[in-house]
């Protein structure tokens, strides 16, 4: 590793200094780094609610993977929905924040569901013949997720929140996964297998047309658009060390690295609605905790 060393004081839960660094050739963004949860509970894949007043995340703190909610600054977490099943993956709210889409094994195999927060009603929206995971909800009221049926080929699908009009929009060999909508709902960012075990970030229209790669080397995963649609946060491994949170412009250029814990895999970035912070999971020895990077004013 190359570059300068920086020390940031960790707030909320920890009272220690965490070393972070900048990589040679990638600009370093200064800001405040805050640990939101303690490791050991399997807290991961956080996403902000549309109003920015709370975070959704999945955690195994109750004995199985379930959906929780807490304030953006950390603190007590509340169970969102009681379930005897495991609810996995990133939770994506509807644009109005009244419903959530998520993955669960409640019917025996992973599928995508929609939860109405007022009534508590849960409805399956993905094809029961397919293993499905990782939904994201667009501003145009369309859900995208990735799915497979036997073998190792994984493709991205879209479906309406009522389960209608399901369409497979990628048709590549290998894996096309981890879709995330641009703020205007016109474009998907995807992680696409490049054939050697690593992934690149691709962009496509909502119907899968005009697909193209915007990264070329390394291993780039878990894209998440900024609220203004100008930048994308990713988890990337550019050498043989660990995954780091990077941000880039929507064409794959102007790459920056945020402050984050060192010697750990830092994954699943999510931008706040006001663009002022990014929350992510930092994992050491498979024990994840949620952290937040706040951009310098």
Model-identified regions with their sequence ranges:
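Beta-strand C-termini and the immediately following turn/loop, strongest in propeller blades
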Residues: 37, 56-62, 81, 101-107, ...
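Blade-terminus and WD-like Trp-Asp/Gly-His loop motifs, strongest in beta-propeller folds
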Residues: 46-53, 91-99, 135-142, 179-187, ...
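Multi-bladed beta-propeller domains
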Residues: 24-42, 70-87, 104, 115-131, ...
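N-terminal export signals
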Residues: 5-21
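Blade-level signature of beta-propeller repeat domains, shared across WD40, Kelch, NHL, RCC1
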Residues: 270-297
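Structural motif
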Residues: 64-68, 109-113, 152-157, 197-202, ...
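Beta-strand-rich domains and repeat architectures in extracellular enzymes and scaffolds
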Residues: 35-65
